[in-house]
Amino acid sequence: TSQDRVADIGAMVTEVLSAMKIVQGFNQEGREHGRFQEAVERTFSVARRRVMIRAAMTAVVILLVFGGITLLVWRGAQAVSEGTITGGTIAAFVLTAGLVAGAIGALTEVYGDLLRGAGAASRLSELLDEQPVITAPARPQELPVPPRGGLSFRNVTFRYPTRLEAPAITDFSLEVEPGETVAIVGPSGAGKSTIFQLAERFYDPQAGSIRLDGIPLTGADPAEVRRRIAYVPQEGVLFSANARDNLRYGNWGASEEDIWAAARAANASGFLQKLPQGLDTYLGESGTQLSGGQRQRIAIARALLRDAPILLLDEATSALDAESERLVQDALEHLMEDRTTLVIAHRLSTVRAADRIVVMEDGRIVEQGTHQQLSSNGGLYARLASLQFGLESA
């Protein structure tokens, strides 16, 4: 339908505009212009066909209506000449017929509106009919209070729904003690990010179990599980709102004092104070008015305000300069005291102080231990460390 084609154009425009620097950097403006033009032409063709059908229907209705009126006038004129009815009567009939004709003509407009509404309703009904895969059980198990922060993976095997032929992790077992800091390292595609998604129960594994403080995640309310976790992604995600709302997104009850304390700990207070309206400054769509490092620091402050017993850090300092990284790392180390922390590290220099380092490859744990132990084992970690530290020193 034309509604589908218009939706496709909207999605294409949003995608290209959000990646404009990539488009320009690879000199693909011409190609994207061509794609957009083709999409517009397809939409125009569908709309033109719809308009032509609608115009034909309108023409038929007008022909029938005015044909009927003409026949009525002709027969009325005959009746007037024969004296069976008066001229006033025929005039009243013609006026009434005109009103009826107008109403019938408007039906074509209503029919067109109904078709457009049916197209939109069809798309909405598909979304409304979708059932959530992850739901709370009828009688969820209560998580321990106060929370301890223990997290365990036992023989977990997981395949993404779109890639059932290739397991993301296989027979994965990991016991994380309360207050322990565990760094997860490995090459791209090893399954590191999958661990985080399973921990927050965005997916359920096909085999094995995941427990939070001894309670299986499948038996707990997903909302309660996520309240005990603070997550900092590799790239800071902000919303089209002011700085204050972005900071307290994970804790709407945070006071002004708490907000500024978290901002100072994340080394974000300096640039926040310089914003035109301070915390009330609108940050633009997805925080486009800030640099990547500034967005990341707001994301870290947001996690600090969450004050959850478990922290998931996906290389939380990767977007910061050297000085800011040191300050934020100090703040994170203070924050991680007495909290369970899982860190996905792409730079091995950020995980040397972890209590334990887990090395993953092809969805499995191949090594684990401290930095000193793994560096002397001559395994995958030692190879990654020698390569990375050698490049950094060079």
Question: How would you label these PLM feature ranges?
Answer:
Residues 144-394:
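ABC-type nucleotide-binding domain
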